[in-house]
């Protein structure tokens, strides 16, 4: 047992670790039968800080995931978009290397390269970010730009993005300062008017201005409990210099701006520029330049802080069919699992899958529209199935997708009686 008193005085207390008396230190903290002084507490903090500094990065020495490894992980869940995957894989790999490089105290400072993902709705921008989050061991958070407003107005401050990152890191400031932030719907904060002096744009240009220093690197004062700041509140200080920002948006209408620029450059009798209807949206977006983003409504300073631009293609019929069946979390597999819980098999013919993909293309909703189409096709069946007996299998073919009949129900009777689609 630790001695609580010295030999010279029964009232004098001593640190159980360094042996200094209460008169030699500023503070002596008492525990069950032990004491620790403020100097030993500070020493322990220094030891822990040094040991964890290298562990703040997800992988240890030599274990940084390669771009190929990151891309292979994305391939398991996201179909197509090879170029965007390469851009993201390299950016995240370099982010890991920057963290390792900084931890070693090298004299060369490596700057970060924030990323802008541009692509049609339903092309996989958000899914890429969500899939990336599963792989990463650094803190990762997603934010919605549509909820942000300029400081002093109703809505969320941009500092709330850093608060979400802190929450993802269990309020470990050191880890949060090395995290990754994905801001979705970034196109919704474009400038609302061509003339910036007409009125105060608190949810457009005002938010862009507020994000500038955050993305470049600043010390943000974050309220631990969230909400608006007030003078009596304590703040956490978070340095955003090493936080990687990835922004994504559909940028509806940007393809027209790009098309106008390309048509203006093509002159002469031999020049040919495909009409907008002849080009897919993704193909047009591939030729996006910073000047197009400026015309769209992003301010020059904001575009300058997103040096890497990755464009996503709109998904064609083959890609949508593959999305339905290939990924680990494919929609067809999900619905087959739901039906399997009822003891019923669910099958789709090849022409049914093609018809579903074509319907999604017609709706111009990309991969996001596939679930709503499947839900509509199977809603009545899922409603009736728990109350029915003897159903062995449900089959969906092209006629079902096109609305000419209901899904075919195969029963377990000897004659394999069919209902639903055969009723005519």
From Swiss-Prot:
Keyword Zinc: yes
Organism: Rhizorhabdus wittichii (strain DSM 6014 / CCUG 31198 / JCM 15750 / NBRC 105917 / EY 4224 / RW1)
A biological-process GO annotation: proteolysis involved in protein catabolic process
Pfam families reported in the protein's UniProt record: AAA_2, ClpB_D2-small, zf-C4_ClpX
Similarity section: Belongs to the ClpX chaperone family.
The protein's role, per its UniProt record: ATP-dependent specificity component of the Clp protease. It directs the protease to specific substrates. Can perform chaperone functions in the absence of ClpP.
Entry keywords, A to Z: ATP-binding, Chaperone, Metal-binding, Nucleotide-binding, Zinc
GO molecular function: ATP binding; ATP hydrolysis activity; ATP-dependent protein folding chaperone; protein dimerization activity; unfolded protein binding; zinc ion binding
Domain ClpX-type ZB as annotated: residue spans: 3-56
GO cellular component: HslUV protease complex
Known partners and oligomeric status: Component of the ClpX-ClpP complex. Forms a hexameric ring that, in the presence of ATP, binds to fourteen ClpP subunits assembled into a disk-like structure with a central cavity, resembling the structure of eukaryotic proteasomes.
Residues binding ATP: 120-127
Binding site for Zn(2+): 15, 18, 37, 40
Entry-linked NCBIfam families: clpX (TIGR00382), PRK05342.1 (NF003745)
Protein name: ATP-dependent Clp protease ATP-binding subunit ClpX
